[in-house]
Amino acid sequence: PEQIIKLVDEMRADFDYIIIDCPAGIEQGFKNAIAAADRAIVVTTPEVSAIRDADRVIGLLEANEIDKIDLIINRIRYDMVKKGDMMSVDDVADILAVPVIGAVPDEEDIVISANQGEPLVAAGSMAGEAFLNICRRISGESVPFMDLDPHRGILVRISGFLKRA
């Protein structure tokens, strides 16, 4: 852990953000990665096993005195949430009891853009918009959460456009 702490301390002078993508778990790689952290962002999906793992990681972060812990919920499928087949963002947030800074819908665009080597944010998709909003929240901006209902989202956008016209 001392080496990563030293490395991150040296990098702080040159960078506003230093992101370390670390493995979830209790092994040494995780412990080394969080040693220099002053903030943690836990990314999970709305499946029971993933939430259980996220809860364990949050406990480890708290045990290591990392006080600023946020949550991103990835691969939300509004149609499944609506049918009761998937936990909602609120359900996951209630279970894990840490602030949610983003929810990313599960979209075909993600797979397509990754396979084509295209940046998702340029695609104009809901997932791309969610990623941009997460970045804005990380930088301290207050950004409302988007409606994950793809059909209602389109209607809201159209009505918003018509109101401006």
Task: Describe each model-derived feature in a short phrase.
Residues 87-88, 119-120, 153:
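Secondary-structure junction/capping motif
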Residues 114-130:
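C-terminal boundary of histidine-terminating zinc-finger modules
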Residues 2-112:
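Conserved catalytic-core segment of NTP-binding enzymes
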Residues 49, 88, 113, 125, ...:
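Generic serine detector
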Residues 80, 122-126, 146:
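A general boundary/transition motif marking the beginning of the first structured unit of a protein
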Residues 99, 129, 133-165:
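P-loop NTP-binding site
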